[in-house]
Amino acid sequence: MQPKYSQRISSSLGLLLLSALFCSSVWAQRATISDKPDTPFKLATFEAEGKTRLGLALGERILDIAAANAQLTKQAKLPAVAIPGEMRELIEQYARVSPRLYQLANHFKTAKLDGLAFAYALDKIAIKAPIKYPWNMLAAAVNYKSHAQEMGSTNTVNTDNEDPIFFAKSPRSCIIDPGEPFFITPGRNIDWEGELAIIIGKPALNLTLEQAHDHVFGYSIVFDVSDRGGTGRRLNATIPGPNWFHGKSRDRGAPFGPFIVPKEFMPNHANLRIVTKVNGVVKQDASTNMLIFDEAHMIRYLTSILTLHPGDVIVTGTPDGVGTARKPPEYLKPGDEVTIEIEGIGTLKTPMRAATGAKQ
């Protein structure tokens, strides 16, 4: 064989070898980034540098999902996956995008996040309500036995033969961000109610108890601000009983957040500690295992009435310890701060302020 042909063959073999090594390296890198839910994360909507972003929280850091996805796709030579920039759309498309979210969490959990433009410290950004806005926010009334008893009820509930009581809160008027104030109208008796929120993941209608959990996306926190009465015009007495709209639909009456935890990371959702404090003093301390109607029974009932949509919020009820049941009754006042902490989800803080005009 002549030398020049030998050199060409050697050169070609070298290029093939380098190409093979490169491809092996790329595929090895792909293979090492698991697309399984190995690393727990929380989801959030947040604002940083004047822009609203969808975030994936890992410990005390939160990643801008869009930017982190772009970098990992390029760095690891992964197939492109378009991830929605709005929470409700992400929930709707979760089956498609969740493997990439798992890859982001699995990769960046061990990465050095300092200096990465898309990684933010939680205390340096503004967390927003995770969904603005769900189609429905539906809330269970008197759904803890201890709360029913403190409110004067002696009834025994049969969850197999009876339906829960629900009311609606207007998402557009009631939902506010974590840390945003609720404005107290002078003379009104405003009470605290800390509650676990269930986030729906798929369209749901006429579900059985067994089908219910499959249609859940995850869990969050809602402060069900409750108006117990006070000064002002009286409600007419044409129909006896409480006026749920008057008591539960105050403007800004549903602080929501800070995170949504996907259900795969909350296997103990039926046994979570829930604590509500006012100015640091514990007022409510209970577990979600004390619910009268559990997740499945609530979803079965609601979907027998209407269709639930991805991103819809079910507010599951509050335990005992509310202000109106205390002796003497206690109500919130301007300057107070309510904090609601639910195990595994986070802490929702809401300051109380005085309403100073017709426009809050």
Residue ranges and their predicted role:
Residues 143, 170-230:
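Non-heme Fe(II) oxygenase catalytic core, chiefly the N-lobe of the double-stranded beta-helix
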Residues 30-38, 147, 184, 228-360:
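Catalytic-pocket segment enriched in acidic/His residues
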Residues 31-34, 44, 126-129, 154-156, ...:
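A generic local secondary-structure boundary/capping motif
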Residues 27-160, 359-360:
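N-terminal non-catalytic cap/leader segment that marks the start of a structured domain
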Residues 155-176, 192, 333-343:
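Structural signature of FAD isoalloxazine-binding scaffolds in flavoprotein oxidoreductases
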Residues 2-15:
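Bacterial N-terminal signal peptides that target proteins for export
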Residues 12-25:
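Bacterial N-terminal signal peptides
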